[in-house]
Regions:
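Acidic/glycine-enriched connector segments
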Residues: 1-157
Length: 157
């Protein structure tokens, strides 16, 4: 069995498909991934969390909510706050990586996920920002990376 760190942008592009994402996550599960580290941010993270919670009805998997600080959702819209609260409540584990917000707490959360996972699944369309930095960090650590939108292929390391 293996573990996966999820990373992706808050903004979802027009061509983003939850159906495709669900198919890709199911492919990961069916090929041995049973633990997912999720940063619980607006956008890609919470969409993944919702899908994985649905998948738990059919597959034995574990969702670990990796929270950068206790007040992560305080500036979320009402819609995303509701999604966040539901997903965090249903997660198998909750890890809060910083006691309070600091300039580096998001990066610390992202590095925690990469350090604890066997590989990374990324929704990346920009070379800047937290997602790009997380992918670069994963590459530095020698972690395999799969990307949203690419067909499933076994890793060859």
């Amino acid at each position: 069995m293996s573990s996966c760190a999820l990373t992706g942008h808050r903004e979802l592009q027009r061509d983003f498909s939850e159906d495709l994402l669900e198919k890709q996550l199911e492919d990961l599960i069916e090929n041995g991934t049973d633990t997912f580290y999720c940063g619980m941010a607006v956008g890609f993270d919470l969409v993944c969390a919702k899908i994985l919670l649905r998948c738990k009805e059919r597959y034995p998997l574990k969702l670990i909510a990796c929270i950068p600080h206790p007040n992560q959702s305080e500036r979320f819209s009402a819609y995303w706050k509701k999604e966040y609260d539901e997903c965090v409540a249903k997660a198998d584990e909750r890890v809060i990586v910083s006691k309070e917000y600091t300039d580096g707490c998001m990066q610390k959360r992202n590095r925690y996920m990469v350090d604890h996972a066997d590989f990374v699944f990324a929704y990346l369309f920009s070379e800047t920002g937290g997602t790009a930095a997380t992918v670069r960090y994963a590459k530095q650590k020698g972690k395999p990376i799969r990307y949203y939108g690419q067909p499933y292929m076994p890793f060859y390391n």
